């Protein structure tokens, strides 16, 4: 019997908490900021070893290096592109 990995956690966090940097990050998740508005998402760390997510990480490295002033990982792509990638990962 397999386990289904939980998807990104943005939908389960109240809107006022999602914009707060002081929200605790659950074990097994990390914070990423995406898009022009730097929207905050919590993603499972298991996404980090997936090739499609690694492409996003490579974009982040090329644009920002290892300097991420928001306190979390900044991914320089459009929000809809990020949601497409993560929704495919959630289906795995």
From Swiss-Prot:
Q: Which GO terms describe its biological process?
A: auxin-activated signaling pathway
> What factors induce this protein?
By auxin.
Which keywords label this protein? Auxin signaling pathway
In terms of superkingdom, the source organism counts as Eukaryota
| One Pfam family hit | Auxin_inducible
The family database entries (InterPro entries) matched by this protein are listed as: SAUR_fam (IPR003676)
Q: Coiled coil: which residue ranges?
A: none
Give the protein family: Belongs to the ARG7 family.
Task: State the protein's name.
Answer: Auxin-induced protein X10A
